[in-house]
């Protein structure tokens, strides 16, 4: 765990808190996503336009691959510990975006069942079932099963072999300095994740190539460890340092700094019962004033509001002009929070219904994909 005073706490397995993202970027060498960089991309996702994805390491490598008509890899995964929620959706959308950005991109998707066991004590048999459900969500979000290789960490010998090799390149003190005092199983799972990220560059997978890993800011310790290992073992494998993009850590529905299963009212699952989902949305933290009169006179505070920031901006309103209208209406005091929640619920519930319909059609395909790794 990286901890710099109480304003910056980064723990990929625990609670992270980032008050100042500029400080995070200075401390650890993350570059900002600039307007000039966005202009180099063939298309720009709303998460980039709205600065939800705020930083990167070596995104230029991916842009160069596109310009030179070269292949690159998009790598991500999921710890199969429960159903897809909004946080899972965020990373999944980034994965699909970078995959669809260029025809020669190919995806690798790790089912992190070893991490689920090390961190959550979830048996491999149980995580297998959860993984199928997670993959059904991923397919419903638009993943092309012909352009991805899906695997379970526990069964992917190339990844496990790399993790063992990498263990010669780090010491216990190094891992403790990066992650803090953790059970050794979590340290090993970090080496396995490094194997996940670098395995696409092995000779049997086509050799060294640019790789991009979209992550939340709290996962940067894994990226830094992996990039360090890529350098240490460059003479053995010819690894190209993996690129990464970073998205903001979003609050839960109640306004807490990070979603936690210990606060179930703060998490919105994609398969949520609609009655419960509605209750969560209507109880979400807002930027409303103390009274309706104050709201009309002073205007609302959408920059503080979970409904506007975390739900509409990040997830459910694609059109930038529509989003701007909603923002201005709130700031002008022309709408009260109850009305805004009702309108937001119409948008969210429609999305959830459509997603559920798509997901039901992908369950068999998800099981097949996990069994066969890719589809032709």
Give the ranges of each region predicted by the language model:
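Structured ligand/cofactor/substrate-binding pocket environments in proteins
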Residues: 84-90, 96, 113, 122-127, ...
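Non-catalytic terminal extensions that flank enzyme cores
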Residues: 1-78, 227-282, 288-291, 306-376
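N-terminal Rossmann-like or analogous alpha/beta NTP/dinucleotide-binding catalytic cores
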Residues: 1-73, 80-199, 357, 375
């Amino acid at each position: 765990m990286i901890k710099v005073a109480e304003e910056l706490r980064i723990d990929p397995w625990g609670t992270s808190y980032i008050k100042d993202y500029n400080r995070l970027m200075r401390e650890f060498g993350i570059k900002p996503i600039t307007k000039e960089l966005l202009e180099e991309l063939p298309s720009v996702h709303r998460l980039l336009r709205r600065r939800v994805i705020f930083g990167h390491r070596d995104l230029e490598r991916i842009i160069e691959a596109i310009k030179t008509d070269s292949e690159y890899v998009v790598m991500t995964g999921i710890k199969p510990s429960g159903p897809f929620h909004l946080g899972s959706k965020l990373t999944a959308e980034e994965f699909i975006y970078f995959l669809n950005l260029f025809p020669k991109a190919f995806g690798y998707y790790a089912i992190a069942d070893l991490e689920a066991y090390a961190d959550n004590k979830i048996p491999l048999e149980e995580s297998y079932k959860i993984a199928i459900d997670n993959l059904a969500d991923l397919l419903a979000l638009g993943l092309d099963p012909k352009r991805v290789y899906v695997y379970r960490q526990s069964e992917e010998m190339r990844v496990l072999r790399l993790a063992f090799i990498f263990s010669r390149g780090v010491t216990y003190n190094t891992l403790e300095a990066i992650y803090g005092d953790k059970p050794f199983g979590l340290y090993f799972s970090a080496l396995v994740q490094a194997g996940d990220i670098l395995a696409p560059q092995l000779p049997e997978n086509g050799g060294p190539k640019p790789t991009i890993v979209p992550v939340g800011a709290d996962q940067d310790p894994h990226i830094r460890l992996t990039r360090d290992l890529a350098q240490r073992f460059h003479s053995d494998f010819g690894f190209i340092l993996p690129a990464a993009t970073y998205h903001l850590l979003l609050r839960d529905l109640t306004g807490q700094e990070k979603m936690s299963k210990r606060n179930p009212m703060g998490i919105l699952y994609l398969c949520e019962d609609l009655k419960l989902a509605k209750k969560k949305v209507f109880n979400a933290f807002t930027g409303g004033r103390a009274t309706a009169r104050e709201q009309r006179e002073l205007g609302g505070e959408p920059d503080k509001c979970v409904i506007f920031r975390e739900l509409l901006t990040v997830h459910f309103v694609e059109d930038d002009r529509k989003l701007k209208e909603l923002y201005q209406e709130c700031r002008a005091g022309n709408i009260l929070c109850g009305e805004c929640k009702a309108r937001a619920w119409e948008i969210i519930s429609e999305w959830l219904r459509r997603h559920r319909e798509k997901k039901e059609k992908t369950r068999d395909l998800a099981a097949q994909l996990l069994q066969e790794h890719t589809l032709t």
